[in-house]
Amino acid sequence: MAMAITAKMVAELRAKTDAPMMECKKALTEAEGDFEKAEELLRVKLGSKAGKAASRVTAEGVVTLARDGDDVALVEINCETDFVTKNDSFLAFANAVAEGVVKNNPADLAALGAMPLAMDSFGPTVEDVRRGLIGKIGENMTVRRFKRFASGKAASYLHGTRIGVVVEFEGDEAAAKDVAMHVAAMKPVALSSADVPAELVAKERSVAAAKAAEDASVAQAAGKPVQSAEIVAKRIEGGVQKYLKEVSLNNQTFVKNDKQTVEQMLKEKATVIKSFTLYIVGEGIEKKVDDFAAEVAAQVAAAKGA
C-alpha cells in the first residue's frame, strides 16, 4: 500500500528546498515518503536551486571564538529559539566556555562539561552552569561542538554570532584573515578538489547522471534526438568537475577579487593554507516544525471533552 503523503510533509519539504508545492508532492510520492530521496529527485528535476536551499539550517544558537596567545578555540552552543541567542547570560556562558576550551584543552564534550566555571550563582563546573541556566532561562541549551587550535599560526573570523571560521596557515596574516572571511561567505567543503569527500563526489555524480537520464527521457518523448552515451558521459563528468571547483577553497573565485582564484591570491602573498574549520549555527540539525493547525484542533477537542 502506497504511503499517504500529507500536507505537512509537503510543507516541510518545500521549506527545505524552496521547490513548488506540486513538485514537492510529486517527489515525495515517487520517493514513497523518503525525504532524502525526495530532495535528490527535486535536484534532478529542478537543478541546483533545490540543493542549495536544502543546505540551509534553522536550529538556533551561537558560534563564538576565544584566543590565548597563539591558541584559538571555536565553539558552538545551541538553544531552542532566536530570542535566547540575545540573552546576556546565554552569551556570557558561550564566551566563558570558549575561554575555558582555549585555556584547558578538554579532550571531549564530557571533559568540557567538567571544566571549572562559576557564573550567575551556578557552578562549580560548566555542566552545572548549563543546567542552572536552563532553569533560569526556561530553554534547553547544549554545547554542541568545539575545536582548539594550537599548532601555530591561526587566523579567525566571526560573522555575527552565527558563523565562525579558523584558518591555520603559514605566511601572511592579512591574507589568511581574508581567506577566513572568504570561507564564511563561500562555504567550501575542502581545501582542494582532491580533498572533497568521496561520498559527496559520488552523490553529485549520481545526481548528474539522473538529470541526464531525465533530459533524455524528455527529449525522446518530444521526438527529439537523444545524446550519445559518449556525450552524456562527458556531460556528467563536466558537471562533477564544475561541482569540485565550486566547493574546493583553492579553486573558488576569491570573494574580494573576482579576477583571481583563492589559490592565485595566496601564491601572490606567499601564503599557504594548511587547514580551515567552518562552524555554522545549527548546521545539519533539523528544527522542529510546529503544526499549529493540529495544535489548535487538539486544544478545541480537549475543551469539548472537558
Swiss-Prot record:
GO terms for cellular component: cytoplasm. One of its GO terms (molecular function) is translation elongation factor activity. Pfam families: EF_TS (PF00889). SUPFAM superfamilies: Elongation factor Ts (EF-Ts), dimerisation domain, UBA-like. Disulfide bonds: none annotated. It comes from the Bacteria. Its main location: cytoplasm. Keywords: Cytoplasm, Elongation factor, Protein biosynthesis. InterPro entries: EF-Ts_dimer_sf, Transl_elong_EFTs/EF1B, Transl_elong_EFTs/EF1B_dimer, Transl_elong_Ts_CS, UBA-like_sf. It is found in: Cytoplasm. Residues 81-84 are annotated as: Involved in Mg(2+) ion dislocation from EF-Tu. The keyword Protein biosynthesis applies. Belongs to the EF-Ts family. HAMAP family: EF_Ts. Associates with the EF-Tu.GDP complex and induces the exchange of GDP to GTP. It remains bound to the aminoacyl-tRNA.EF-Tu.GTP complex up to the GTP hydrolysis stage on the ribosome. NCBIfam families: tsf. This is Elongation factor Ts.
